């Protein structure tokens, strides 16, 4: 996620980091469907996403993920924390996190407001992530 969509934000340092991360994922996981950088509304609303896509691309093809995203990656911890708490509080979503990646094992920094069920959900999610990571190493 970004304040920019498909290059609309120019050469901002944060956008360049996001673009670099997207290219790295594409190189390391070519089967993964990933698109970006994009604003939240374009990521989850197909009509808005396609409108922006067609105004920024020379191609007649349509994106697969735009407007249909089921995973949202935030550019930093601040944005991620704000997003997940807003989704919980305003949208009625259940959050399993935050779960931080990039360490030897998943790490969670639970909110002081977490309930017992929140803690159990995060622990179960992290257990599954560790299991998947171990299977990938084998």
Task: Report the location of each language-model feature.
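Glycine-rich phosphate/nucleotide-binding loop
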Residues: 26-138
